[in-house]
Amino acid sequence: MDIRTGNGFDVHAFGPGDHVWLCGVRVPHHRGLIGHSDADVGMHALTDAIYGALAEGDIGVHFPPSDPQWKGAASRIFLEHAMGRIAARGYTLANCDVTLICERPKIGPVAPAMREALAEIMGIAADRISVKATTSEKLGFTGREEGIAAIATVALLQA
């Protein structure tokens, strides 16, 4: 049996705005996240974890930020592409785990909605998806509330 794991990491800085996109959910916040696409840091880390497990680079390889067609793009496009690559390579996604690192917004109240949104985008059961959060105890850029970071891990099984 061929089992593959992948890890992804992403960060985005805060900027002007009244919400952030996190794991496919629009979360009200007094600032937005700056990025070439919709800056969904959780979905970007998850997408990179999938590409990593497949040894197919990262989001930038598949969707170059220098290409204007991806300006403002919904991150679900990237995740759907990565899921398609899993199937094309003969794998299935066993499970995934996303950790959002921020002081605010608080993730706990919206984590179930994030799991459901990811399940819908990925076409898998929500019980195969974990979304959780932690803080950096007021240390570093996330502690100073300058942005949000995300870490994701996936496990793939040969179909």
From Swiss-Prot:
InterPro entries: MECDP_synthase (IPR003526), MECDP_synthase_CS (IPR020555), MECDP_synthase_sf (IPR036571). Its EC number is 4.6.1.12. It catalyses: 4-CDP-2-C-methyl-D-erythritol 2-phosphate = 2-C-methyl-D-erythritol 2,4-cyclic diphosphate + CMP. Its cofactor is a divalent metal cation. Pathway: Isoprenoid biosynthesis; isopentenyl diphosphate biosynthesis via DXP pathway; isopentenyl diphosphate from 1-deoxy-D-xylulose 5-phosphate: step 4/6. One of its GO terms (molecular function) is 2-C-methyl-D-erythritol 2,4-cyclodiphosphate synthase activity. A divalent metal cation binds at D10, H12, H44. Keywords: Isoprene biosynthesis, Lyase, Metal-binding. The record marks H36, T135 as: Transition state stabilizer. 4-CDP-2-C-methyl-D-erythritol 2-phosphate binds at D10, V11, H12, H36, S37, D58, I59, G60, T134, T135, S136, E137, F141, R144. One of its GO terms (biological process) is isopentenyl diphosphate biosynthetic process, methylerythritol 4-phosphate pathway. Binds 1 divalent metal cation per subunit. Involved in the biosynthesis of isopentenyl diphosphate (IPP) and dimethylallyl diphosphate (DMAPP), two major building blocks of isoprenoid compounds. Catalyzes the conversion of 4-diphosphocytidyl-2-C-methyl-D-erythritol 2-phosphate (CDP-ME2P) to 2-C-methyl-D-erythritol 2,4-cyclodiphosphate (ME-CPP) with a corresponding release of cytidine 5-monophosphate (CMP). Homotrimer. Belongs to the IspF family. NCBIfam families: ispF. This is 2-C-methyl-D-erythritol 2,4-cyclodiphosphate synthase. It comes from Cereibacter sphaeroides (strain ATCC 17023 / DSM 158 / JCM 6121 / CCUG 31486 / LMG 2827 / NBRC 12203 / NCIMB 8253 / ATH 2.4.1.). The lineage of its organism: Bacteria, Pseudomonadati, Pseudomonadota, Alphaproteobacteria, Rhodobacterales. The gene is ispF.
